[in-house]
Regions:
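Glycine- and acidic-residue-biased ligand/ion/polar-headgroup-sensing regions
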Residues: 43-63, 164, 175-213
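Ligand-binding loop in jelly-roll beta-barrel domains
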Residues: 71-110
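Surface-exposed beta-loop interaction hotspot
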Residues: 98-159
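N-terminal functional module of multi-domain proteins
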Residues: 37-70, 75-79, 88
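A short glycine-rich, His/Asp/Glu-containing loop-to-beta-strand
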Residues: 7-38, 134-181
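Histidine-centered metal-chelating micro-motifs
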Residues: 38-39, 77-90, 166-168, 211-213
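Conserved hydrophobic/aromatic beta-strand scaffold that supports enzyme active sites
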Residues: 28-32, 48, 79-81, 101, ...
Length: 213
């Protein structure tokens, strides 16, 4: 976790950097943009650009699409997933926009893809409901893993936590976790895949109030 008194600044704000620690296998940061800003990337890594809020035009591989996300708490994710050495341009169309950027070393090639709610491995799944007096109720949105993109080195998504609730599994014995289904989503396996050295990123956010939508 990175703590700051002044908040994120306009431009790219690095939070973690691949290689800073022996088990840090990815870069992660937040890009803050203002209307008219244009930012270009061509990274030697697999990259995922997640629109957190705002209206942005993505340009990549001779394609272009303008997308908008008004609330990361109430709306499905929108993200651009590209392999290494893919030129990407982002243009801010709203007064402000925020984009979460994840990168990891991966030489494998795959087709770049702009993903929306219907493209996700499992979107807006309510987990923990009805258990422990709702102490672990949360919304889990799984973008992708190797079941829907075999070439990726990411297992990535968003977790929206309610105020005062656990943002993941509450403390339980590891032995119990081995026999616990991690998802009720029909698209996902009922056990965590065992990969050799995956890069894992879950963006955890807490809304100001219980969602009504």
């Amino acid at each position: 976790m990175k703590l700051t008194n002044s908040g994120f600044q306009r431009g790219y704000n690095p939070i973690v950097v691949e290689g800073d620690a022996s088990d840090m296998n990815m870069d992660f940061g937040e890009l803050l943009m203002e209307k008219g800003d244009t930012v270009s990337y061509n990274e030697p890594k697999e990259c995922i650009y997640v629109l957190v809020t705002g209206k942005v035009t993505f340009r990549w591989a001779d394609k272009e699409e303008t997308v908008e996300r008004k609330s990361c708490f109430h709306e499905d994710p929108i993200l651009l997933h590209v392999p290494q050495n893919t030129a990407v341009e982002l243009m801010c169309q709203s007064d402000k926009a925020e984009v979460s950027i994840q990168r990891t070393t991966n030489p494998k090639h795959f087709e770049p893809k702009l993903m929306k709610g219907e493209d996700l491995l499992c979107g807006s799944e309510l987990r923990g409901a009805g258990l422990m007096n709702e102490a672990s109720t949360r919304i889990v949105r799984t973008f992708l893993d190797r079941s829907n993109c075999p070439e990726t080195n990411f297992f990535i998504g968003e977790v929206v936590s309610y105020p005062g609730k656990w943002s993941s599994f509450p403390p339980i014995p590891t032995r119990s976790l081995r026999s616990t289904s991690i998802s009720s989503c029909p698209k996902m396996a009922t056990a965590m895949p065992r990969w050799e050295t995956p890069s894992i990123k879950f963006t955890t956010t807490t809304p100001p109030a219980w969602p009504t939508a």
